[in-house]
Amino acid sequence: MGDWSALGKLLDKVQAYSTAGGKVWLSVLFIFRILLLGTAVESAWGDEQSAFRCNTQQPGCENVCYDKSFPISHVRFWVLQIIFVSVPTLLYLAHVFYVMRKEEKLNKKEEELKVAQTDGVNVEMHLKQIEIKKFKYGIEEHGKVKMRGGLLRTYIISILFKSVFEVAFLLIQWYIYGFSLSAVYTCKRDPCPHQVDCFLSRPTEKTIFIIFMLVVSLVSLALNIIELFYAFFKGVKDRVKGKSDPYHATTGPLSPSKDCGSPKYAYFNGCSSPTAPLSPMSPPGYKLVTGDRNNSSCRNYNKQASEQNWANYSAEQNRMGQAGSTISNSHAQPFDFPDDNQNSKKLDAGHELQPLAIVDQRPSSRASSRASSRPRPDDLEI
């Protein structure tokens, strides 16, 4: 009957992701259907057409009578039945492989976040999100998938289709053959000259195999029904249990921590980068917005960063000891820091930009040097 090893290997992988009833169903499918069909049943029906004889010498009469008595061979009919009832299980296996692929991606992302955590980045929120996704997909351990959520629904749908196919093939078999074979078949069909009798080889043996395959189909159908009820109640139990699940009941809405003290955490969670360049002079009407305007933690962090930048800039210019025209205070624009009570805040008085000198860095000409009365460090004292 061909090589069943490919189908057997695929169905064998389903064992690890099935319930107890599903494992029993697969055992029945392997032992009492595939194995028996490939050995005893095939040999019993090996001469079904060659040993079919009719009491006439009319050419072609035996062929048309055999076609009328057996529109499709029992063996080929059972092969189709096995394929159809196995397809829903293979679709469920495809969903399992999809979940396992998701597990690999989540594990890879989790490793990257843990590496970032060792560098001082607070990624607890993102790690918690990955844990919730694993729980949603039914991933408990590496390589182990628990049946819940979408995977459970796929499993229930596969059981429903298997049950429908079992019932459909039983009805088709009953309509075409019945569940027993007669030793003599009467045929009246062209080109037979008259009504002829045709004889079937080993009708009793074939009837026994037909009844046996009927019982196996009924057992498989009963297992599907039991497994369907089990999966249904399991889904209801998981739904009730999910309301008190620690991932949903205790965590609450996920939100980033309000401590933006760490520069890396501030950058990782959407606050302004601690190394973001700030313009020393903002044109009138320009407002520098940093971070999330609705996030109080980022607001505090941005305020401290901007004040420090202005202070550093003032100190650097003062150290240069330059004199000259000063920068108009009108060019120093306040930064906006949204608050609950007011729209904007100016920098504190201690952090206002002091008037600074701007000096032309080009060397002075001789005329300017003579005209200048300002003492220089290299002048001789008299």
UniProtKB/Swiss-Prot annotation:
Matches recorded under SMART domains: CNX, Connexin_CCC
Residue positions where Phosphothreonine is found in the record: 275, 326
Biased composition (Basic and acidic residues): 342-351
Domain of life: Eukaryota
Pfam families tied to this protein: Connexin (PF00029), Connexin43 (PF03508)
Entry annotated with the keyword Metal-binding: no
Keyword annotations: Acetylation, Cell junction, Cell membrane, Disulfide bond, Endoplasmic reticulum, Gap junction, Isopeptide bond, Membrane, Phosphoprotein, S-nitrosylation, Transmembrane, Transmembrane helix, Ubl conjugation
Region (Interaction with UBQLN4): 264-382
Region feature Disordered, mapped onto this chain: 317-382
Modifications the protein undergoes after translation, according to the UniProt entry: Phosphorylation at Ser-325, Ser-328 and Ser-330 by CK1 modulates gap junction assembly. Phosphorylated at Ser-368 by PRKCG; phosphorylation induces disassembly of gap junction plaques and inhibition of gap junction activity. Phosphorylation at Ser-368 by PRKCD triggers its internalization into small vesicles leading to proteasome-mediated degradation. Sumoylated with SUMO1, SUMO2 and SUMO3, which may regulate the level of functional Cx43 gap junctions at the plasma membrane. May be desumoylated by SENP1 or SENP2.
Record carries keyword Disulfide bond: yes
Modified sites of kind S-nitrosocysteine: 271
A GO cellular component entry from the record: cell junction
Low complexity bias locations: 362-374
Chain ranges on the Cytoplasmic side, renumbered to this chain: 2-23, 98-155, 229-382
Subunit structure and binding partners: A connexon is composed of a hexamer of connexins. Interacts with SGSM3. Interacts with RIC1/CIP150. Interacts with CNST and CSNK1D. Interacts (via C-terminus) with TJP1. Interacts (via C-terminus) with SRC (via SH3 domain). Interacts (not ubiquitinated) with UBQLN4 (via UBA domain). Interacts with NOV. Interacts with TMEM65. Interacts with ANK3/ANKG and PKP2.
Family stated for the protein in its record: Belongs to the connexin family. Alpha-type (group II) subfamily.
Protein name: Gap junction alpha-1 protein
Organism: Sus scrofa
Lineage per the UniProt record: Eukaryota, Metazoa, Chordata, Craniata, Vertebrata
Gene name, Swiss-Prot/TrEMBL: GJA1
